[in-house]
UniProtKB/Swiss-Prot annotation:
GO process terms (BP): cellular response to cold; neural retina development; photoreceptor cell maintenance; regulation of transcription by RNA polymerase II; response to activity; retina development in camera-type eye; retina homeostasis
Family: Belongs to the NRF1/Ewg family.
Residue segments, region Required for transcriptional activation: 303-488
One Pfam family recorded for the sequence: Nrf1_DNA-bind
Localisation per UniProt entry: Nucleus
Gene Ontology terms for molecular function: DNA-binding transcription factor activity, RNA polymerase II-specific; protein homodimerization activity; RNA polymerase II cis-regulatory region sequence-specific DNA binding
GO cellular component, one term: nucleus
InterPro entries: NRF1/Ewg, Nrf1_NLS/DNA-bd_dimer
Record region (Dimerization): 1-78
Protein name, per record: Nuclear respiratory factor 1
Coiled-coil regions listed: none
Subcellular location, principal: nucleus
Keywords: Activator, Developmental protein, DNA-binding, Nucleus, Transcription, Transcription regulation
Species this protein is from: Danio rerio
Length: 514
């Protein structure tokens, strides 16, 4: 019994010794791992996934990239931006350079705020001296922004001039040959040293840029405003030779072309005259509309697209509608007073009859979602009518007597409730622009119910088919009855329920059969 106890005790002692040994091993491994992590922090490059970053070949990896090449050729600031973009691409980050200066400024503010929060968390949790340093070596006022833990932040500020000098020398070594030749004839279009397309320049930027451009174009130190002898031959005839900081055109000219668009025309004319149109459009994506033609029916099918338009108030009181993305001016409105919230010209659908068979051929033209905050109601209706007419003109000509179903999404605008005759006139203009003689307009939903109530046929689920010549009369009647006006689209199989007579014109009340 005693021998068994001794044996068991020895066995337990062996197990305990093994456990202690295992614990020691775990402690050793943990210590080694922690030491390895610290060593990795000390020795690793700025991106731990990569090898030590070699800036001797900084632009070769992106030499074929048009954005980087364009930046590198724009001077020291552009070269610094190109090197930064190349660094991010070498590390396979999924981001791209933002070519729009306004959007780039917003992104800069957002990301700097995010960096500050991350840096504060890092210094507090980890307990290390860390900073964020942002530099743009432009002259004479370079951007040097540093924030982070003290006293490291103050130490870096102390060596600002040395850091800037070393950075400029390093960038000069990588600058492409002949990078400064662009400014020998005309200055490149740049905002804060970064190239920009002329269509993305704001009015304030254009007003500040044009006098500098004139120095290069005319060779004079001052433009000589008001002196016809100093006026360049490329200056637009419809723009007075006067200081561009104010618009002195006639009211008619202001109504026709916005001041921002006129300033862009000045810049374009100058660069075209000097044969440097290549400098006008930096990073511009050439977007072409793809049109597929069906051989059997010869019907043009336009790929649906959504055009977003933003408003810009001009100093002369006009409001320009600028297409987001391209910067092109869609329309210029005369006054900046009341205008409803959102206008969308949505779809134009039509069906034709060929050899006794009904075929549905769709031309979807989703053109121009406009968020408009200020203008007159009459301007709104004219803008909608113009957009719709342009959309219809883009589609194939329709046969006489074809049935068209149209929609003006969200064009209730409290429709006839608020604007009455103006709204009715705009929609009637759309109808007349779309249909040839003998065509029909199909109303649905609430509008159909309203027309049904007017004609004594209260069928809220049906469609109302109205001749083009009578459409404005019907819509005006709805407006006077405080009904929202909407022209609905949905060419589907219908069943005629009733035929009414309205002012001598036949009005058919039909019901959907889906």
């Amino acid at each position: 019994m005693e021998d068994h106890t001794v044996h068991q005790t020895e066995h337990m002692t062996t197990i305990e010794a093994h456990a202690v040994s295992q614990q020691v091993g775990q402690v050793h491994v943990a210590t080694y791992t922690e030491h390895g992590m610290l060593s990795a922090d000390e020795d690793s490059p700025s991106s731990p996934d990569d090898d030590a970053y070699d800036d001797s070949d900084i632009l070769n990896s992106t030499g074929t990239d048009e954005v980087t090449a364009h930046l590198a050729a724009a001077g020291p600031v552009g070269m610094a931006a190109a090197a930064a973009v190349a660094t991010g691409k070498k590390r396979k980050r999924p981001h791209i350079f933002e070519s729009n200066p306004s959007i780039r400024k917003r992104q800069q503010t957002r990301l700097l705020r995010k960096l500050r929060a991350t840096l504060d968390e890092y210094t507090t949790r980890v307990g290390q001296q860390a900073i964020v340093l942002c530099i743009s070596p432009s002259k004479p006022n370079p951007v040097f922004r540093v924030f982070g833990a003290a006293p490291l932040e103050n130490v870096v500020r102390k060596y600002k001039s040395m850091i800037l000098e070393d950075l400029e020398n390093a960038l000069a070594e990588h600058a492409p040959p002949g990078g400064g030749e662009l400014s020998s004839e005309l200055p490149p279009l740049t905002i804060d040293g970064i190239p920009v397309s002329v269509d993305k320049m704001t009015q304030a930027q254009l007003r500040a840029f044009i006098p500098e451009m004139l120095k290069y174009s005319t060779g004079r130190g001052k433009p000589g405003w008001g002196k016809e002898s100093c006026k360049p031959i490329w200056w637009p005839e419809d723009i007075p030779w006067a200081n561009v900081r104010s618009d002195v055109r006639t009211e008619e000219q202001k109504q026709r072309v916005s001041w921002t668009q006129a300033l862009r025309t000045i810049v374009k004319n100058c660069y075209k005259q000097h044969g440097r149109e290549d400098l006008l459009y930096a990073f511009e994506d050439q977007v072409t509309t793809q049109v597929a033609t069906t051989a059997t029916h010869s019907i043009a099918h336009l790929v649906p697209s959504q055009t977003v338009v933003q408003t810009i108030s001009n100093p002369d009181g006009t409001v320009s509608l600028i297409q987001v993305g391209t910067g092109a001016t869609v329309a210029t409105l005369a006054d900046a007073s009341e205008l409803p919230g959102t206008v969308t010209v949505a779809q134009v659908n039509y069906s034709t009859v060929t050899d006794g068979e009904v075929e549905q051929n769709w031309a979807t033209l989703q053109g121009g979602e406009m968020t408009i905050q200020t203008t007159q109601a009459s301007e709104a209706t004219q803008a909608v009518a113009s957009l719709a007419e342009a959309a219809v003109a883009a589609s194939q000509e329709m046969q006489t007597g074809a049935t068209v179903t149209m929609a003006l999404n969200r064009y209730s605008l409290e429709g006839a409730l608020k604007f009455g005759e103006a709204a009715a006139h705009a929609v009637a203009t759309l109808a007349e622009a779309t249909l040839q003689g003998g065509g029909q307009i199909v109303l649905a939903g609430e509008t159909a119910a309203a027309v049904g109530a007017l004609t004594g046929v209260p069928d809220g689920s049906g469609l109302v088919q109205i001749p083009v010549s009578m459409y404005q009369t019907v819509v005006t009647s709805l407006a006077q009855g405080n009904r929202p006006v909407q022209v609905a689209m949905a060419p589907v199989t219908t069943r005629i329920d009733n035929t009414m007579t309205l002012d001598g014109q036949a009005v058919e009340v039909v019901t959907l059969e889906q």
